[in-house]
């Protein structure tokens, strides 16, 4: 093999081929846009494998396997060039690729209110659902306690909502009272009240059809 390469480089005649050496199987080479296309001979067969086990006596020998594909495509020179500006393209791994895809059931944002087990309709044959082997009370206890714990975790949520609504109502009442007190203690309201009192005191006591009559003269001078 090395003698063939040296003969190609130095233009020396090729040495005589050995019968044991496999013959060349490349019949044509063509380079198109940086791609090297090689055509193989149709009569090329794969060499026998010395380490393969012989076929059993009852089976016929396998047919010689021809190479299915006779075209080999090599990458263009831009991927194999060497140099500071001609080096092969290096792909950098993104750190986000290492993140695991989280299943919705395993999410950390799931609260206790969403985990509620709905009891289905009772089975017509409850004894058939149990296994044949007898289980102790200690083994059956966790299966019965688990849905109860989940229901207890979901129960406080409505009570908390009611408490929040009551607290909101109390805050609204307090704000209304504060606004009323500020309105009564404001300077404008006090001035209006004082003016109303003064206007009432200035009014005469007798109004309407009352006629004032002068008194008789006592002295004649």
Curated annotation (Swiss-Prot):
Question: Record's InterPro entries?
Answer: TP53INP
Q: Which GO terms describe its biological process?
A: autophagosome assembly; macroautophagy; negative regulation of protein localization; osteoblast differentiation; positive regulation of DNA-templated transcription; protein localization; tissue homeostasis; ubiquitin-dependent protein catabolic process
Q: Which UniProt keywords apply?
A: Activator, Autophagy, Cytoplasm, Cytoplasmic vesicle, Nucleus, Phosphoprotein, Transcription, Transcription regulation
Q: Name one GO molecular function term.
A: ubiquitin binding
| Segments carrying motif LIR | 26-41
Quick check: keyword Phosphoprotein in the entry?
yes
Q: Where is this region: Disordered?
A: 41-68, 177-210
GO cellular component terms, alphabetically, are: autophagosome; cytoplasmic vesicle; cytosol; nucleus; PML body
Q: Phosphoserine modification sites?
A: 136
Instruction: Report the main location listed first in the record.
Output: cytoplasm
Q: How does it assemble?
A: Interacts with VMP1, GABARAP, GABARAPL1, GABARAPL2, MAP1LC3A, MAP1LC3B, MAP1LC3C and THRA.
Function, as annotated = Dual regulator of transcription and autophagy. Positively regulates autophagy and is required for autophagosome formation and processing. May act as a scaffold protein that recruits MAP1LC3A, GABARAP and GABARAPL2 and brings them to the autophagosome membrane by interacting with VMP1 where, in cooperation with the BECN1-PI3-kinase class III complex, they trigger autophagosome development. Acts as a transcriptional activator of THRA.
PANTHER family according to UniProt: DIABETES AND OBESITY REGULATED, ISOFORM G (PTHR31671), TUMOR PROTEIN P53-INDUCIBLE NUCLEAR PROTEIN 2 (PTHR31671:SF2)
Could you identify this protein by its name?
Tumor protein p53-inducible nuclear protein 2
UniProt lists the gene as Tp53inp2
